Amino acid sequence: MMLSRAAVRSIAGARVAAHAASPLLSQRTLPAVWTRSMAKDNKPPKFSKPESTPAQKATPKAPEPAESEKAEQKQQQQQQQQTPAESEPEPEIDLSKLPDLRGGIPTTLEYEMAQKEAGKKPVAGEEAETQAEGAEGPEAATSGSGGGGRKKGQLPDSAYVSSTEKRRQKMANWAFIAAGLALVGGTIYLGREWDEEELEKHHDIPNGWGLGLWWKRAKARMTGTVSYYQEPAFEKLLPDPDPSFERPYTLCISLEDMLVHSEWTRDHGWRLAKRPGVDYFLRYLSQYYEIVLFTSVPFANAEPIVRKMDPYRFIMWPLFREATKYKDGEIVKDLSYLNRDLSKVIIIDTDPKHVRAQPENAIVLPKWKGDPKDTELVSLVPFLEFIHTMNFPDVRKVLKSFEGQHIPTEFARREAIARAEHNKLVAAKAKKAGLGSLGARFGIKPSKLNPMAMEGEEDPSEAFAKGKMIQDIARERGMRNYLAMEEEIKKNGEMWLKMEQEAQEKAQKEMMKNMQSSVFGWFGGAPSGEQQSGESEKKA
């Protein structure tokens, strides 16, 4: 019994020794961290020799095998014990060049397309993988799993477009088709024949079914749609002249940088300054000209300024941005829309671009920047008064003679020359007896015989004899009228403003009353304005 146990133990010990000596079954100690150099090096990894355990040391050695087997095992053990050359040090990775994966994995479509266009050959690893896939057979190449699917060049470029991008392209194509159909349909609709009102405006483009006529009508309608926003608000900006208050000339003036100047500062914000002599300019010339304010400032901004600057309404017609014309990206004040004879119209502005439609009617002044000692505006009054006094048939010829010159200075120079010549003629010419001396015998004053002389004025013949010129007489008359107007404003100015305020309030109440009656009238609740006025008359 004991002999059998000893035999079993010896056989088991021999098996353990054989397993420990076998190189195929020896345990290997693997490194704890896998590095990128393991993939680059084709060398086998470094293994450490397994240490014998106490159990193995206690186990008795098995009988040695044959000599050939011993030599082979010894050679394998020597190969394992030989230490391989140390691998090259692993290069440090520049973390700044790594892609930012916080927004998702970047696409490789651009890289693949660039390689395909440049005809770049794949790297060694990719070539090996391609050969391995080719060796595996068509089944591995067509399968979508395991080897990573199809490689570059096996699918068309459209296969790399996502479904979202395909949907967007499809929607864009449909949008282009719809836009093209709308363009064709709109052109066909705009090219329809004129109605009676349109035919009167477009005599040069008759009705017809020709392709050329169709296109001309469509083009004319499209141009008319755009011009609606570029042309002035009305074809006639001013009503027909009133015979009872008609002036022979029309004077158009600007607002910004001519009558007022606005500026903004950090300390005071927006401030508005009134030019020196504005009141005198407006009140004095209102007796000679139909004054029209023609400004490029919108109504909402300019109307309160005009109401404050001219409370007594010497400006007869204010025209704002809505009355200007928009052409080539600039605002133009076109005088042809004024409903006035252009030979009797003068426009004063500070921007040559605003008056480029009729430069022959324009006087361009330098912009006023807020100088309190400025006299440029007042110095124009004698020249404008002279035009009215001489009653020129066409003011454009007069303005042409002053082209390129400072009008107040040149006019003063010409007037001085004319005055010197007039004084020479008066001194050389003997005083002749005429109707004046004949009337004096009968006790009739000369002023009564001259139709040009007004009540309280000096007779023109006597004025000429004293060396006065006709513009001097007109200036004296204009100054008397101006002083009389100033006196009336001082006496009754507040009353006029109060009456105007009451009239405005009354008009607002009437407007509100009419609006309420019309709204309630839709529902049959309140009587109309005529019924209310009739009831009030009955009560009275």
Curated annotation (Swiss-Prot):
Every FCP1 homology domain range: 244-387
Bilayer topology: Single-pass membrane protein
Family matches, as CDD domains: HAD_FCP1-like
Subcellular localization, as worded in the UniProt entry: Mitochondrion inner membrane
SUPFAM superfamilies noted in UniProt: HAD-like
Major subcellular site: mitochondrion
Listed InterPro entries: FCP1_dom, HAD-like_sf, HAD_sf, TIM50
Pfam family, one: NIF
GO biological process: protein import into mitochondrial matrix
Gene3D superfamilies: HAD superfamily/HAD-like
Transmembrane segment boundaries: 172-191
Domain of life according to the entry: Eukaryota
Region feature Disordered, mapped onto this chain: 35-164, 519-540
Assembly and interaction partners: Component of the TIM23 complex, at least composed of tim23, tim17, tim50 and tim21. Interacts with preproteins in transit.
Name of protein: Mitochondrial import inner membrane translocase subunit tim50
Organism: Neurospora crassa (strain ATCC 24698 / 74-OR23-1A / CBS 708.71 / DSM 1257 / FGSC 987)
